[in-house]
Amino acid sequence: MSCKVKICGLKNREDARTAIEAGADYLGCVFFPPSPRHVEPQNAAEVFDMIGDADVLRVGLFVDPSDDQLMEVLNHVRLDIIQLHGHETPSRVEEVRLNFGLPVMKALPIETAQDVEAARAYDKVADRLLFDAKPPKGATRPGGNAIAFDWNLLTDTSWDSPWMLAGGLNVENVKDAIAQSGCKAVDVSSGVEAEKGVKSPELIEKFIAAVKG
């Protein structure tokens, strides 16, 4: 089975179309105003409308959201997965799953083997796990910082929840990342951008081809 690909931080219909036609398995929109990839719910609905009947999942990324913030988006946007990318506890992850009846993907910052072990508190609690690089000190965003971590930290680890790899992935390194980590899915945002917050259709196509080629 080929590795699945999530293109995150999409802001317009054209980039969504490019990702879908290139073979993306997940499209992600960011609902976090400090991010250069933030979109309003109405814009996200337009992005996801491009999926049509394609076998592509809609992912909404949130950072420590309240139930009201989640509901505000869900009133306008159909999501298949809620991605929590903040400091949400395992109990909060479970609460969101129950309150909204949607699968939850929990992003977990990784830098050391201790971080990998700490992530186990979310295994089987979240429907999916997303291992991302720990943001640098002083960073205003928990992800999308174009930073990688040591993928060997995940080699031969076993998880009950399906997991995805993120953090500094790009066309040049994604094959090595898959080989070293053993991941079955990858998530990219900054690695397919021409500039911060602006996707490159060419890089989207090349990234997906590198993963699935």
Predicted regions and their residues:
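Conserved N-terminal beta1-alpha1 strand-loop-helix module at the mouth
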Residues: 1-185, 190-213
